[in-house]
Amino acid sequence: MARLVALDRVRNIGIMAHIDAGKTTTTERILYYTGRLHRMGEVHDGGATMDWMEQEKERGITITSAATTCFWTPKFGNYQGINHRINIIDTPGHVDFTVEVERSLRVLDGAVALFCAVGGVEPQSETVWRQANKYGVPRIAYINKMDRTGANFFDAVKSIRERLGANPVPLQIPIGEGEMFAGFVDLIRMKGIIYDKEDGSTYQEVEIPHDLQNEAKAWRINMLEAVSEHDDTLLEKYLNGEDITDEEVRKVLRQATLQVTIIPILCGSSFKNKGVQFMLDAVIEYLASPVDVPAVEGHHPRTEEPISRKPTDEEPFAALAFKIATDPFVGKLTFFRVYSGVLKAGSYVLNTITGKKERVGRVLQMHSNKREDIEAVYCGDIAAAVGLKDVKTGDTLCDENNPVVLEKMVFPEPVIQIAIEPKTKSDSDKLGMSLAKLAEEDPTFKVKTDEETGQTLIAGMGELHLEILVDRLRREFKVDANVGKPQVAYRETIRKSVEFEGKFVRQSGGKGQFGLVNLKVEPLEEGKGYEFVDAIKGGVIPREYIPAVNAGIQEAMKGGVVAGFPMQDVRVTLFDGKYHEVDSSEMAFKIAGSIGFKGAAKKADPVLLEPIMKVEVVTPEEYLGDVMGDLSSRRGHIEGMGQRAGAQFVAAKVPLSSMFGYSTDLRSMSQGRANYSMEFECYREVPRNIAESLQEKRTSKDAE
């Protein structure tokens, strides 16, 4: 089967935004206009195609990033009349599902950033924007909900410049705002576009309304100045007052967008069907095809030698698995992005992370939760494989004769955990397996057993995250479970450098045990995790015992030394030691490593850490005092405040332990008129009185 669409006519895009900016509605409209849907779905009536889990339809929010493919032929511009394929990943906007956004951005070549014309840049917009910056994803911005009361296009553009530090360049300005929103002025072609009041897919091209002509000219000059800064020839023409063609403007705009030095700005109302077709034209015109993206970098699994794979069908096959999902009909689905080469259904791939070879039974093209079997998947495409058993998110799949490891994805550690127990004996049998499946799909969801109580603990990124996973247990896996109160995932670390000798000796007739290690422990900066340095010289400890020392240290770190919480941000150097020809063993050195670490950590000024959350509350002015007072009473530190979209906002850093049940309290405090967003910021030292009470709990638990 030959490639259907030339590689330079493919666009892999994501739609990213704050929770209520209209992401799913916009995707629905895209699918409608590209002919994939025959009836438009609405989020508010639970009929949207991309929201395919039951909870998503109930809550009206998107949780998993569904992948779909569609085709579009631009009506205007440098690609006019040429059919293109668009692969879309619809990403969630709720902060608890950051991992879904992170992993979809990793495999995209471009994104449409949606902003609400009333709210402008909101907290989650900032988070998603930072993630897109991390992966250098080119973006266009679409200011949605122009029909809403209080919509202000220019305020939204200003907030993109000020809050995101971006360089927004409007390519359109609205004709009317709020109920009066009728269409927009196209600043490249200097034409007005007026939409039919009843049917938004019908529009008329008109001369620019008289009262907007001066404003349109001013914004066109703004656009030309911004664009000409990126091209010397254009700059010369502009300064000499020569005519600049639309084609030249678009060409340089495309280059600047791909370099992420300009963010083209469009406007519309997806719900009212205004502006979506022009946004699709802009996706084709300004966002990258796989050909525009640099060769993907990786390394050889054995030699660590750098390898790059060019985006062509002729290169050996290399792909990144970016999502695992359980499908009720075909079982485990592995979503992957092909960076080079071709994969045929039925062929074998090598997973260079596990070292295992696996057969791809079927290759599926996904349309939300419907699927279509395809014979082969080509470079630049996004598809799903059936039949891969041992693949995890972030694994590299490649041609077995040309192994490569692509850069792995790094996911944040969970900050909240709850105990979970099955309601009945039959639930008990299924619980472990079901939780394992959910953990396989979501790298920020962890399952562990409390060694002292035997309880199963589940950990995640927030209350909503865990609530939805427990809900999925009930709906998809038919497992009923009781859950405990949320607990904070405290951590421990050290503040001083210390050297210590760890010794394990047991000699009581027969073969004994002997291991002696000299360790130096020192603090690392926050977020660095754990580092082990092997500084053994002259074979004072044989090579084969050193991994055992490392394993012993890591085991000891899990239980901490202050209140039984895992330790982080520590470097341990093994610099000396002794061994015995007969009595030494891996086990002896593992125990010596554990003893040495615990002894050193106790002397290294150990402290307890707690997760601090970045909280932003938007509230009507009359409740501002109450909101601020309440945040302060929760040990919150107010970082800033101001006005946004006719309301007040307060930004604060608050310990997670003080935020449980906050949504209920905020609702009653503001009669349901305030809302808030919360995301993990960092770990900070716990105040002494709280640390002492946590230690007391630990001591009384040990005494039991």
From Swiss-Prot:
UniProt keyword list: Cytoplasm, Elongation factor, GTP-binding, Nucleotide-binding, Protein biosynthesis
Source superkingdom: Bacteria
GO CC term, one of those recorded: cytoplasm
Binding site for GTP: 17-24, 90-94, 144-147
Subcellular location(s) of the protein: Cytoplasm
Signal peptide annotation: none
Molecular function per GO: GTP binding; GTPase activity; translation elongation factor activity
One BP annotation, GO: ribosome disassembly
Domain tr-type G: 8-291
Function summary: Catalyzes the GTP-dependent ribosomal translocation step during translation elongation. During this step, the ribosome changes from the pre-translocational (PRE) to the post-translocational (POST) state as the newly formed A-site-bound peptidyl-tRNA and P-site-bound deacylated tRNA move to the P and E sites, respectively. Catalyzes the coordinated movement of the two tRNA molecules, the mRNA and conformational changes in the ribosome.
Family per record: Belongs to the TRAFAC class translation factor GTPase superfamily. Classic translation factor GTPase family. EF-G/EF-2 subfamily.
Protein name as annotated: Elongation factor G
Gene that produces this protein: fusA
